[in-house]
């Protein structure tokens, strides 16, 4: 069972954030109903289709295995449908053959060669501040209002929210609030299975601050098997690389506590972005280093070289390199 004290704190947080100013907000909502209704009546549903295709060719060098080249792909098709202009029904179809790839890059897909739905969710607004999300298939981080990093963690091997937003792929429902001063808060119930029960359910809560050049979040993730807590922050100075840092702790039901941390820099240049980072990449707290560059060849075509080093269980190092091409359509 999730610790009662922690759950009560999470519920108290939820009530404070979302209902404290409910009375003050109700009048503003009522005043907008008539004008919004008129706009919705004139709005015709629209659907936009976008896609991305990654080719990844790379190799991994380690002392315990022979070197070889690996060539994989990831294909995603995104359908965004809006019924009244302030909502979005997102459907993502995905395929990819990187299940056996030793590179284990975030931009690789392990879904298999058959096109499958990987995300299906509906997002809608109550007013200018409140937003809700619901769907049968989504990731734990989707629907959270806060911005935790200025670094692109969707390319290589490091991720600063491995535990605090990890709920697998499954159903979820959440509500979030964004204020004009940058403060935000989110509460989400998610599951890693279509059968939602005490074993699979996750309670994810987050508070944060997002400004143009700095921000951060505090996030918790409560589950029967673990409780995770994390803090993340970023700063984007002018004419210098952005700095992002995060640390999170995962308390297992076995009594073991593991941590995950990332320190990263990212810089935008004339036609490219460059990023470097160091941090832990697995539950054994092994250290990894990564560097990448995203080079814009055209609006629809990018080349992304990736280089990484990671410690393994034999106290040696794995050296990896890949050339990735991204096509947008």
Q: Across the structure, where does each feature detected by a protein language model lie?
A:
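Classical Sec-dependent N-terminal signal peptides that target proteins to the secretory pathway
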Residues: 2-24
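Beta-barrel outer-membrane channel/assembly domains of diderm bacteria
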Residues: 22-132, 159-189, 199, 208-210, ...
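Short, solvent-exposed beta-strand-terminating loops
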Residues: 94-96, 139-145
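Outer-membrane beta-barrel and related beta-rich outer-membrane complex signature
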Residues: 103, 144-148
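Residues on the solvent-exposed faces and adjacent turns
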Residues: 136
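A short alpha->loop->secondary-structure connector
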Residues: 148-156
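Detector for outer-membrane/organellar transmembrane beta-barrel domains
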Residues: 180-185, 198-288
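Active-site-adjacent "lid" and substrate-binding segments of diverse enzymatic cores
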Residues: 192-194
